[in-house]
């Protein structure tokens, strides 16, 4: 689960992290009032969407030369004008795709006198089972370019969660950022505070970009992006309350209500599979046969007829879907139950696109018999390769 920047900063502040003063705003008037509560004389008006690259982003509705989603304002009138420009408009960034995201809230913060910018992030390294703290002296909006052009400028400090954060980890961060004296001590302390926040709230990713040194010698978290492990949210009702469903795909929200793992993609073949690994293999083989998956959808190991019906409805809610491939390997899950769900779903949604089904595993013959006797135009497949070839052929035939 993702949260907005202003929420991330409020959370980090509870762990002692230094952040600029700021207030969220839902209207232009609220943005003006937020600015009046801050000392100024410079304010920063920030679009709040669940995507990075806001500073270099562009608003669809504004002229091409208009500023992006992070703007300096030198007067209250500029705050008002910038807020009016952003609210209700669609911000397109490197992370949103061409569709962009509508800006429904802003974050007005105090300006900072910046001397230097740095980069610091933390994430779970699943390969090693450790926490990776990634730092660079090249902070700011172009960290992706730094990673591409000069990867040697990015350092990784690995922390074993069983050992926890130790002083030498903090010193390694400060050394990598080339900080000395009091700034070195601040960096050591900040690294520990961020680690504590990361662990205590079950974050999966924390990105500070930029971390700045101000002209008066202070380290300040100027921007923060946070994601949480959704599987751990039951332990954090306070964090779950921060969820902004307007930033999420409605189909993904509906899928979560049925305990379905659904991610919308840009292709035209809808996929319903049990197991993440099999789902990824299914998507790969669709691409191998010349078309692209419209989604990742894992129904899990305990799918019921109702769950399968919901999965079909979610897949077909995407108007780009031109065909559906169901690929089920029934171990815990019974193929006859899946077949019943497929038949019920196809009838309920009045299926109008080609459907190819590959079943294997527990009660597979009963499942195949149910599909064959359903009277529905369901194409059966014997294996994964056969299924991919058939769905591509059926979609092309229907075009």
UniProtKB/Swiss-Prot annotation:
Pathway: Carbohydrate metabolism; tricarboxylic acid cycle; succinate from succinyl-CoA (ligase route): step 1/1
Function noted in UniProt: Succinyl-CoA synthetase functions in the citric acid cycle (TCA), coupling the hydrolysis of succinyl-CoA to the synthesis of either ATP or GTP and thus represents the only step of substrate-level phosphorylation in the TCA. The beta subunit provides nucleotide specificity of the enzyme and binds the substrate succinate, while the binding sites for coenzyme A and phosphate are found in the alpha subunit.
SUPFAM superfamilies: Glutathione synthetase ATP-binding domain-like, Succinyl-CoA synthetase domains
One example of a Gene Ontology biological process annotation: succinyl-CoA metabolic process
InterPro entries (UniProt xref): ATP-grasp (IPR011761), ATP-grasp_succ-CoA_synth-type (IPR013650), ATP_grasp_subdomain_1 (IPR013815), SUCC_ACL_C (IPR005811), Succ_CoA_ligase-like_bsu (IPR005809), Succinyl-CoA_synth-like (IPR016102)
Record's protein name: Succinate--CoA ligase [ADP-forming] subunit beta
Keyword terms: ATP-binding, Ligase, Magnesium, Metal-binding, Nucleotide-binding, Tricarboxylic acid cycle
Catalysed transformations (reactions): succinate + ATP + CoA = succinyl-CoA + ADP + phosphate; GTP + succinate + CoA = succinyl-CoA + GDP + phosphate
Short name of any one Pfam family annotated for the protein: ATP-grasp_2
NCBIfam families recorded: PRK00696.1, sucCoAbeta
Species annotation: Rhizorhabdus wittichii (strain DSM 6014 / CCUG 31198 / JCM 15750 / NBRC 105917 / EY 4224 / RW1) (Sphingomonas wittichii)
Gene Ontology, cellular component aspect: cytosol; succinate-CoA ligase complex
Location of the ATP-grasp domain: 9-254
Binding locations of ATP: 46, 53-55, 112, 117
Family to which the UniProt record says this protein belongs: Belongs to the succinate/malate CoA ligase beta subunit family.
Required cofactor(s): Mg(2+)
Residues reported to bind substrate: 274, 331-333
């Amino acid at each position: 689960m993702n949260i907005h920047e202003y929420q991330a900063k409020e959370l980090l502040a509870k762990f002692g992290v230094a952040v600029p003063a700021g207030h969220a705003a839902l209207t232009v008037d609220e943005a003006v009032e937020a600015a009046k509560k801050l000392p100024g004389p410079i304010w920063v008006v920030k679009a709040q969407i669940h995507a990075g690259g806001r500073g270099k982003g562009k608003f669809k509705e504004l002229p091409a030369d208009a500023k992006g989603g992070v703007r300096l304002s030198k007067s209250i009138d500029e705050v008002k004008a910038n807020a009016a420009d952003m609210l209700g408009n669609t911000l397109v960034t490197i992370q949103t795709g061409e569709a962009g995201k509508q800006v429904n809230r802003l974050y007005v913060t105090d300006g900072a006198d910046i001397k230097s910018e740095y980069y610091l992030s933390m994430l779970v390294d699943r390969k090693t089972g450790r926490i990776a703290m990634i730092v660079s002296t090249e902070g700011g909006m172009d960290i992706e370019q730094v990673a591409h052009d000069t990867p040697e400028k990015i350092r990784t400090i690995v922390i074993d969660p069983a050992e926890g954060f130790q002083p030498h980890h903090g010193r390694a961060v400060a050394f990598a950022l080339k900080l000395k004296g009091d700034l070195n001590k601040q960096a050591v302390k900040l690294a520990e505070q961020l680690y504590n926040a990361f662990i205590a709230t079950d974050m999966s990713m924390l990105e500070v970009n930029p971390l700045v040194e101000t002209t008066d010698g202070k380290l300040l978290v100027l921007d923060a992006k946070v994601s949480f492990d959704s599987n751990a949210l039951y332990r954090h009702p306070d964090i779950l309350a921060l969820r902004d469903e307007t930033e999420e795909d409605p189909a993904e929200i509906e899928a979560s209500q049925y305990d379905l793992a659904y991610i919308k993609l840009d292709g035209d073949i809808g996929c319903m599979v049990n197991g993440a690994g099999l789902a990824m293999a299914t998507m790969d083989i669709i691409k191998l046969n010349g078309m692209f998956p419209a989604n990742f959808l894992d129904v899990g190991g305990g799918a019921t007829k109702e769950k399968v019906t919901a999965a079909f409805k979610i897949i077909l809610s995407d108007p780009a879907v031109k065909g559906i491939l169901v690929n089920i390997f029934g171990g815990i899950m019974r193929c006859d139950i899946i077949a019943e769900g497929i038949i019920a779903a196809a009838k309920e949604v009045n299926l109008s696109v080609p459907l190819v089904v590959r079943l294997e595993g527990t009660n597979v013959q009963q499942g195949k018999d149910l599909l064959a006797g359903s009277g529905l135009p369901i194409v059966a497949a014997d294996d994964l390769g056969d299924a991919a070839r058939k769905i591509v052929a059926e979609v092309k035939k229907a075009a």
